[in-house]
Structures are given as structure tokens and as C-alpha cells.
């Protein structure tokens, strides 16, 4: 998963997108963070038939960026392999199915407030903006999708 983050940061540099690549994302969320989330059973991945990871994220049942106690799964560190097509949408669909299986009503995430293409992507997948959040230099928009 960490390798995908590094690959995506390089892609952002190439595309002139200023997000993870200029915020020290790989230092805020180093390899040890992902190893810990894996050991806690909180890291999830979508793989191809050969076992290569196409998309991955950390799924949490609590998130300090949200102040309510609605039954939700919170998607963090979502990353897809560059060129993996609709892997992100497929991952989020499956994350929603998982959330329903464990009796959650919402799938929630946040994204950078200055990334309009990503905002449109999430809105097209049914995630509506419901507020903002701040984490150090990061300023984000909280989004949720009602599942039931």
C-alpha cells in the first residue's frame, strides 16, 4: 500500500497536482503506519487476479474529524494504482458493502478542499459534502454516502 502512495505522489508531481506530494504525506503516514494498520486488521485492498494491489485504504469505525456518532465506516488513505481504471470506484463500492454487513449506515471520507476533479469524482459516486475538517496544513471537505 505504501508503494502505491509513493507511486501516486510521483504521478501528482508529473501532473502538477499539489496534494500529498507537497504536504509530506509519506512522512505523516510512513510505512510503519501502514504496517500498524495491517496488524490491526484495518487495511483493506482490492487486488487483481494475480494478487497485485489495485486500490487500498484504511477503514476505521471512529474518526476524530467527525463529531457525531452516526454508524459509519471512515475511509482513510485511499490510494489506487496509477492506470488502474475504475479500481477506486470498485473499492468504495465494496467498502460500502462491507459497511452494510457490519450494520453501518454511512461510508465517509474527506478530500482536499482544493481538488475540484476529485470532488466531482466523489460526488459522482454519491458522496455529498457535509462539512470541513483541518489536520495540520491539510484542509479538507468531509463527504458521506448514505448506505441504507
Predicted regions and their residues:
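Short glycine-rich hinge loops at helix-strand junctions in the catalytic core
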Residues: 86, 103, 126
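Conserved beta-strand-loop-alpha-helix junction that forms the acyl-donor binding cleft
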Residues: 109-119, 135-138
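Conserved acetyl-CoA-binding loop of GNAT-fold acetyltransferases
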Residues: 122-132
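Residues forming the Rossmann-fold NAD(P)(H) cofactor-binding site
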Residues: 89
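Hydrophobic, well-ordered secondary-structure scaffolds
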Residues: 96, 131-135
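Terminal substrate-recognition subdomain of acyl/acetyltransferases
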Residues: 134-148
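Conserved GNAT acetyl-CoA-binding A-motif
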Residues: 99-112
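Acetyl-CoA-dependent GNAT
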Residues: 3-15, 19-83, 92-94, 98, ...
Amino acid at each position: 500500500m505504501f508503494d502505491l502512495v509513493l507511486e501516486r505522489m510521483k504521478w501528482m508531481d508529473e501532473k502538477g497536482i499539489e496534494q500529498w506530494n507537497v504536504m509530506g504525506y509519506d512522512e505523516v503516514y510512513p510505512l510503519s503506519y501502514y504496517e500498524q494498520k495491517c496488524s490491526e486488521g484495518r487495511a483493506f485492498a482490492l487486488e487483481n487476479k494475480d494478487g497485485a494491489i489495485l486500490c487500498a485504504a484504511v477503514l476505521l469505525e471512529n474518526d476524530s474529524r467527525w463529531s457525531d456518532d452516526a454508524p459509519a465506516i471512515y475511509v482513510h488513505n485511499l490510494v489506487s494504482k496509477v492506470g488502474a481504471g475504475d479500481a477506486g470506484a470498485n473499492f468504495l463500492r465494496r467498502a460500502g458493502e462491507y459497511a452494510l454487513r457490519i450494520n453501518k449506515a454511512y461510508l465517509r471520507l474527506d478530500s482536499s478542499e482544493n481538488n475540484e476533479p476529485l470532488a466531482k469524482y466523489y460526488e459522482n459516486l454519491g458522496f455529498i459534502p457535509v462539512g470541513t475538517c483541518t489536520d495540520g496544513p491539510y484542509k479538507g471537505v468531509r463527504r458521506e454516502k448514505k448506505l441504507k
